[in-house]
Amino acid sequence: MAADPTTDAALGDLRELLAANDLALLDLVNRRLDLVEKIKQRKSELGVSFVDPEREAWLFDYLRGANTGPLSDDGLRELLTTVLDLTKRELAGN
């Protein structure tokens, strides 16, 4: 007979930890948006383009060097692409 996942204490504890990590991730994304908004404003004042493909490439290389796994390089690229695309969309009207 299979265990009931709704009453398994260890599973519940792991889900609570995951939920805490998800909240931390949400906070980090919101903080990132605040910082990028400031960068966008400063770049506008300097007459510099908001999107910088060279900086995005540098960021991927930097994060790839810092990544200790288990996230793969392909997974990192997908995550970063998603975050950058989301950031650009969120700040498009600002």
What annotation goes with each model-predicted range?
Residues 1-94:
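Domain-level signature for soluble enzymes in the chorismate/prephenate branch of the shikimate pathway
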